[in-house]
Regions:
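Short, surface-exposed beta-strand/loop micro-motifs that present aromatic residues
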Residues: 153-160
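Pocket-forming structural segment of enzyme catalytic cores
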Residues: 86-153
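Short acidic low-complexity segments
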Residues: 1, 26-37
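Beta-strand-turn-beta hairpins that frame and shape the catalytic cleft
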Residues: 126-129, 160-165
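Acyltransferase
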Residues: 169-193
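Cysteine-nucleophile active-site neighborhood
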Residues: 47-114
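N-terminal beta1-alpha1 ligand-phosphate binding loop
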Residues: 2-24, 169-173
């Protein structure tokens, strides 16, 4: 069973539908035992970084996720990806610290938020099409960046560190291509030894 962490932030039902559509057993949950027993953890989210961290801390889910970070594959989607990092300039708040790096404001001549379809740029053969973004902040990280999207500057679109994968765009809203990316992430990601 794949645990989709329900911490009261964002449109997470679409993520559950997408994972189930791929043939996996996904469950929205905030129950500690269910999360501990899961095979994978997905941390979704849309909204403000500070509000999300406040919700995770209030429930104790932040400590649980940190405890499990090396024991289970984890996928962060959109705000969920950003929460996996050390710090965000959005609200000047510490994140979960699972992946080195920080979340910074998109400083570009283009409209912010970065909203709509944008092409991925990557050396990985799967990652060559448009995906759906909606965000005003992006990640700067020394961790392996799997794909970027150009938006006046290179936006980190997919990052992977060990068993942790961050996806800035919404694979659940990116059609069959987005589902294929989500499936690949659930199968272990994009870096293989």
């Amino acid at each position: 069973m794949i645990a989709i962490v329900d911490y009261g932030v964002g449109n997470i039902k679409n993520v559950e539908r997408a994972v189930n559509h791929l043939g996996y057993d996904a469950q929205l949950t905030s129950d500690f035992d269910t999360i501990k027993e899961s095979s994978h953890i997905i941390l979704p989210g849309v909204g403000h970084f500070k509000d999300a961290m406040t919700a995770l801390k209030a429930s104790g889910l932040d400590k649980l996720l940190i405890e499990l970070q090396d024991k289970k594959p984890m996928i962060g989607i959109c705000l969920g990806m950003q929460l996996m990092f050390e710090h965000s300039d959005e609200g000047d708040v510490e994140g979960l610290g699972m992946i080195p790096g920080r979340v910074v404001s998109i400083d570009t001549p283009y409209p912010v938020p970065h909203l709509g379809w944008n092409n991925l740029e990557s050396k990985h053969p799967l990652l060559d099409k448009d995906v759906y973004f909606i965000h005003s902040y992006y990640v700067q990280t020394p961790a392996p960046i799997i794909a970027t999207a150009e938006y006046g500057l290179p936006i980190t679109a997919i990052v992977q560190k060990d068993n942790k994968i961050g996806i800035q765009f919404h694979p659940e809203k990116s059609g069959d291509f987005g589902l294929a990316i989500l499936d690949q992430a659930l199968k272990g990601g994009f870096i293989h030894d």
